[in-house]
Amino acid sequence: DVNNISYSLMWKDGIKNVYLAKLSSIQKVIKMLANKHSKEAMLSLTHGQPATPTTFGKEMAVFLSRLNKQCATLKGLGLECKLSGATGNWAAHHIAYPNINWIRLTKKFISRLGLKHNALTTQVECHDSLAEQYHLLCRINSILIDFSNDMWFYISRGILVQEKVGGETGSSTMPHKINPIHFENAEGNCGLANALLVHLANKLTISRMQR
């Protein structure tokens, strides 16, 4: 009971003060690009082939809109917790203090922590609400992968130009190059995170009997 509440509070704090804070800085940059280049015309590609005109700003606005929607959903999701004893029946609680309404008391306590009360559980909280957040993070990460892919192609097409950073080596044999390594790393890191999040979402929601 203590652990599921403690971990939920840590996760909640991490999402708010680390993940969403970092993501907000990315959203601000994309918003700046969308506004600054709203009239910068370029040729769009469908299936990798020349299509119709678009603007760089509009394409950035698409990613901003997608991220904004998912972030709003994430902020609205709550984490469920339990405080109902060894097998979720408040048995020991009731034996010790039979005159207390334990369901109402534990709900009030958990709500005060900014969490949601799950009254029907086994020994462990089912983690469905946590899995829901994991899946949503996967969607956000997939949007970031899509963004990184497109930025990689904009650089390749010469639409965007990278600035050389002192101390960075573009290539072991071609030092004149500036490879889009940060976007490539972002793809890999987000993909790895998604693999772990999907596994955790699938694993944590399965429990043998009461545990």
Explain the meaning of each model-derived region.
Residues 2-211:
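Conserved, well-structured ligand/cofactor-binding cores
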